[in-house]
Amino acid sequence: MRCDLHVHSVASGMCSTPGLNRICRESYNDAVEVYKRLRTLGMAIVTITDHDSIDAVEILRKYPDFFLSEEVTVRMPTGTEVHVGVYDIRERDHVEIQRRRNDFISLVMYLTERRLFFSVNHVFSSLTGHRDERDFDWFASYVPALEARNGQMCRKANADAANLAARFGKVAIAGSDSHAIAGVGLTHTEVPGARTVEEFFAGLVQGRGRIHGAHGGYAKLTADVFSIINSLLQEKPWTLAISPLALLVPFFTAGHWLNEIRFSRKWSAMLEDSEKRTQHLWDVAPHAHDLIPEHFSFGISLESSLGPSLGASA
């Protein structure tokens, strides 16, 4: 059973690029078109991971092989932000996840209590801003999975993410992270023998998952940006007046691509030079132990934290 675990649609909202965040969307992918393309490419189950949104569910809930997920912007105890994929949720989970997303500890407590599978995405990317070395301690202790292949990241960043997942003993997942329709489904996760969504995630936790598909590249990134610009021009014809600025796109994407490579090299080198640390929550934040109820136990092992039945109960 195959699934692209990182896909975007028009419901992902506006882009985060300064100057464009008022007029341009993160993605113009139509949810139904995404669904049909994924099925055509052999995905047995389908999800969409829009940024802090589950609006696509209204269109796709009629499909029995669709399950609800989202990509959550989460604030770490260090003040940095990361993108966390949360899978097979219910609509009520989305409300609580959004309420807690500015508090990593609170969010992890909820996800663990609800036995929801989650991952840190594009761990070696600068897309969410700067990173703190202590963030990796949190990942090592309280995140069950890392995105080890992202269809928009360079091969080196993906290799570093895969190595980190192996080093921390985490589940490795893959997804296209495609904001343009052309890349949807080209990177995916497979669990041989799985027949349902529940069996798929159980197989991941049991270590039977495999990652497949394309890495990112400068040409691919540039083509995706031009695709988004084309969709913007169709949605807002008045933007034709600023269309000559599109000539700058190859320079913009080159700068972004080089920065991503630099970011990945910097952090992979720092982690290689540091001693592997898997700390308890109160080792990272001494006063955090006081925040945890006596009856609550973090599941450090994947089996104990996520349990045998991974789907959220209705």
Range-by-range predicted roles:
Residues 237-276, 304, 311-314:
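Extended, basic/helix-rich recognition subdomains
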Residues 70-74, 83-88, 119-128:
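Conserved catalytic scaffold of divalent metal-dependent phosphoesterases
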Residues 75-84, 155-158, 183-185, 200-205:
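Short, charged, surface-exposed secondary-structure boundary motifs
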